[in-house]
A protein has these predicted regions:
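Juxtamembrane membrane-water interface segments that cap and precede transmembrane helices
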Residues: 1-23, 132-148
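Generic alpha-helical segment signature
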Residues: 2, 17, 35, 58-62
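Generic structural signal for secondary-structure transition and capping sites
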Residues: 5-6, 29, 47
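Membrane-interface loop-to-helix entry segments
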Residues: 24, 28-31
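Residue-level signal for the membrane-embedded core of alpha-helical transmembrane segments
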Residues: 32-37, 88
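Terminal, non-globular segments
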Residues: 39-43
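Membrane-embedded architecture of ER/inner-membrane glycosylation machinery
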Residues: 44-171
Length: 171
């Protein structure tokens, strides 16, 4: 166990070489569609000393940055290495919703926009699913369209975009 982890940290294993900035886009995509709240949560981390009972945001930011720095330093990089940081990201996103101001409203509008974009992407799946060509899964594209999963995703993302827009307007 230790040898295998040390090997992945110090040398590239299975051609999983990625640039040093690899986990930046992974963090952005992993937080979708609430990426604006993650950005807002990170921007609102107090840069000064706060009492321990109010330090959850600093703790979550340190946790997220520690995982980011640790796996950025590793030679082998995979998107799944980001998983230990997801609870910290969730805390930062949740804490970003606690203070009502124009930045929070911006984050809501941007998140709803991302949900709407995802709905459009799923509705357009007949256009892009055919581009998926993987020799190990030759029937993935027709199977994916035939399963109805992308249509259900399109429907649910559309529903979420409309419902959250109505709620935001009524606030």
């Amino acid at each position: 166990f230790g040898y295998h982890n040390l090997q992945r940290f110090t040398s590239v294993v299975n051609d999983h070489l990625q640039p040093w900035w690899f986990f930046g886009p992974v963090m952005v995509v992993a937080a979708l569609p609430f990426t604006p709240f993650l950005i807002l949560g990170l921007a609102r981390v107090p840069r000064w000393r706060v009492p321990p009972e109010h330090s959850l945001q600093q703790f979550a930011a340190c946790w997220l940055v520690a995982v980011l720095l640790l796996f950025t330093a590793a030679a082998t990089k995979l998107p799944s290495y980001w998983l230990p940081a997801t609870p910290a990201a969730a805390l930062l996103m949740a804490l970003a919703t606690t203070r009502r101001d124009r930045w929070q409203r911006w984050a809501w509008v941007a998140s709803i926009g991302l949900v709407a974009c995802l709905a459009v992407i799923f509705w357009l799946s007949p256009v892009w699913v055919g581009w998926i060509r993987d020799p190990e899964m030759p029937s993935l594209a027709p199977d994916l369209l035939g399963s109805g999963l992308v249509w259900r995703a399109a429907l649910w993302f559309s529903f979420a975009a409309v419902l959250s827009s109505v709620v935001l307007i009524q606030r």
